[in-house]
Amino acid sequence: MKDIKTYSNKNILVLGLGKSGFAVSELLLKLGAKLTLNDKADLDKNEKAQELKAKGVRVIGGHHPVDLLEKEHFDYLVKNPGIPYENPMVKKAEELNIPIITEPEIALSCSDAPYVCVTGSNGKTTTVMLTQRILDHHLQKSGHHAYAVGNIGVPISEVVPKATKDDILVVEISSFQLLGVTDIDPKVAAIVDIYNNVHLDYHKTFENYVNAKLNVTRTQNSDDYFIANYDQKDILAKEKEVTPAKMQTFSETDSSADYFIGDEYLESQNEKIMKIVDIKLPGIHNLQNSLVAIAISKVMGADNDDIAAVLSTFTGAKHRLQYVTTLDGRKVYNDSKSTNIEAATVAIPSFKEPEVLIAGGLDRGFLFDDLVPLFKKHVKSIVLYGETKYLLADAARKAGIKDIVIVNTLQEAVPRAYELSEPGDVILFSPACASWDQFRTFEDRGDYFVKFVKELKTK
């Protein structure tokens, strides 16, 4: 780890103490910072907070003391990405011209290991997992490793102290994290895709959302690489304006892109890389994710053997078209990460078999008409729950689906989907909505879905 002096003897307030908040606090202590930790939750019984307190860190829990920023001098405020910029502490810091920084930027500035960054509305976690596995396969030949970090669930600050210059960090970075980033320089940056109804409750406008995503490449240099989606032409034009890096493109359909999906192979302009039939992940969108992982991995030194070793065995990330089990001849898939319409539009066409779809969740004010053609082509029956059940039912009726079942909860939906299905069908849970009407997170929702399926299997 680089022993940078930027934060040495600086008074720093860490706001929001989730997993990354605690990890960056430990890192800042190593760098010689003087820390104050604050969270609106009571921290008296929080084991990690008390450990830091024992190391001399001031811990303030239960409220956000806005007046503290006026009473004392702070050199930086480190903001948890989930805390909005409308938060009173953040607004006061802005008023007082206290620099607001983020965990990724601090951690990456200390990294001895080169790093690549992946963002996007959908597909970034799967892409990161594929990339990490390919690069790890490549690096293990020389006794080194690739680490998947960031929004994927492992704070960057946790891994940076142990990663060497011969390792590689594969960073999943969200728009929430990127909004606060002013200076990162990934060797490779990639934007898998950008859709216009994602996280607008946080970013307020689509333009703000796009600009946050573009921060992943804005401060790269001319020796770096940027991987862009050739099929999203409007976004591509903005990316060309912003990036200083060498651009490579990928496409689902256009063979003029640097990497593309051919008739039988994933291909580049120079070669046929891998037979599509040998790739384990289902769905055209996962072929696209594979192209991004290939493009990144090639820049970082991996070869086709590394790529084939991973793509021929990797069966998917949890909650992302995750195969759960087979129930009496019916394959069951958990796609709880489908928190928006676009995610459902890539999940639903992923199977050749007839589908019984389970969908529904938080009502964000969107209509579901974009799903009508997919419902018509792929879905034989549908079970709906949550705040959006009636809106989704309207779309299902427009698609001509006859078996439309409306229930109140996911627990009720699972056995009804089984009843509507036949051997040879796929039961697909792809909600097309956020989880917060009935669940804490999409992970929580997906875990419950798997639990309900397993309960059904034991009956």
Curated annotation (Swiss-Prot):
Catalytic activity, EC: 6.3.2.9
Reaction(s) catalysed (UniProt annotation): UDP-N-acetyl-alpha-D-muramoyl-L-alanine + D-glutamate + ATP = UDP-N-acetyl-alpha-D-muramoyl-L-alanyl-D-glutamate + ADP + phosphate + H(+)
Enzyme class per UniProt: ligase
Residues noted as binding ATP in the record, renumbered to the chain: G120, S121, N122, G123, K124, T125, T126
Pathway assignment: Cell wall biogenesis; peptidoglycan biosynthesis
Any Gene Ontology biological process: cell wall organization
Keywords: ATP-binding, Cell cycle, Cell division, Cell shape, Cell wall biogenesis/degradation, Cytoplasm, Ligase, Nucleotide-binding, Peptidoglycan synthesis
Pfam families in alphabetical order: Mur_ligase_C, Mur_ligase_M, MurD-like_N
A molecular function (GO) term: UDP-N-acetylmuramoylalanine-D-glutamate ligase activity
GO cellular component terms, semicolon-separated: cytoplasm
Disulphide linkage map: none
Compartment(s) of residence: Cytoplasm
Role noted for this protein: Cell wall formation. Catalyzes the addition of glutamate to the nucleotide precursor UDP-N-acetylmuramoyl-L-alanine (UMA).
Similarity comment: family membership: Belongs to the MurCDEF family.
Cross-referenced HAMAP family: MurD
UniProt protein name: UDP-N-acetylmuramoylalanine--D-glutamate ligase
